[in-house]
C-alpha cells in the first residue's frame, strides 16, 4: 500500500524514470533522506521505457567520462546492495573505424581514458575478428574495410527498467518516498521561497525541486512559466528475429558479442536473445509532439517507417 503523501520535504523530484529515481537515490547517499519523488503514471513510463540500455564508456570529455565510469561501476555493485538484478550484460563495446581520421580520434582518446582509469584497447582488424567472429571485415565498394577499432571490455548494455527498480529499492531503504499516479498540476512559489506543488492527491511543499520529466519536459516547464527547448524526435530501430548464425555461435560456446558501434555510418548493433537490435542514427529524424507528448505514449511505439532510413 502506498504511503500517504507527505506535506513537506527538502527535495521533491518530479518524474519517475531512471534519471529521476537515480537523483533520488543519490540524494539519500549524500544524507538527504527527507526527499520524495512523484510520478504521473508508473515508474519507467516514458523515455526510460523507450531506451535501448546502451552504456557507452567512450567520451572525449574528462568530466563526462568520469560520470560514465562511475555509472558502470555503480551498476556492478547495485545488485549486491539492493538485492535487485539490473540485467547488466558486460559484453564489451567495439567502436569500429573505417577511416584514418576515426583511428586518430581513438588514439587521442587514450589520454582521457588513462587519466580516468577506463580499461580499453585500440585494436587491429585481426583482433576485431577475434572478438567478433561473425563479422566480415569488408573491403568492397559497398562495404568500407574495417581498419581497426576501440574496444572497451567493461562496457555493455543494461535493462533500464530493472536499473530503475534497483535504484528505487535503494532510495526507499534510505528513507525516500515515492508516489506513483501522482501528477504535478501546478507550482507556486511561497513567501518563504519554498515551492508549493499541487497534485491530484494533495499539496506538497518542497525546499528544492528537481525536474526529471524527460519527454514531458516542455509540459512541466510551462507549468513554471519556462520554455524548455526540448522536443522529441522519432527514432526507428529494428529488432531481428532469431539469427541462425548467432544461435549456432552461442550454442557452440561463444560468449555474448560486444555491442558494435559504427560512427561514420551511424548505427549500433547488439544481441537480443538469439537475434539482433539494430539502431541507426538517422539524419533528419522528424520532430514529434511539439505541443506536448500525449498521455498514451508512455509505453507506446511509433509505426514502422524504415523507408526513410
Give each language-model segment a name:
Residues 5-19, 36:
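Beta1/beta-strand and adjacent pyrophosphate-binding region of the FAD-binding site
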Residues 6-8, 86-95, 109, 129-174, ...:
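Helix-loop-beta segment of a Rossmann-like dinucleotide-binding subdomain
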Residues 19, 43, 216:
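Conserved Rossmann-like nucleotide-cofactor binding loop
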Residues 28-49:
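Glycine-rich FAD pyrophosphate-binding loop
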Residues 53-134, 264-269, 273-277, 287:
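Dinucleotide-binding Rossmann-like beta1-alpha1 core, especially the glycine-rich loop
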Residues 150-208, 216:
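Helical element adjacent to the flavin cofactor pocket in flavoenzyme catalytic cores
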Residues 203-256:
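Central helical "cap/lid" subdomain
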Residues 226-227, 243-309:
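Active-site lid/adjacent beta-loop-alpha segment flanking the redox-cofactor pocket in flavoenzymes
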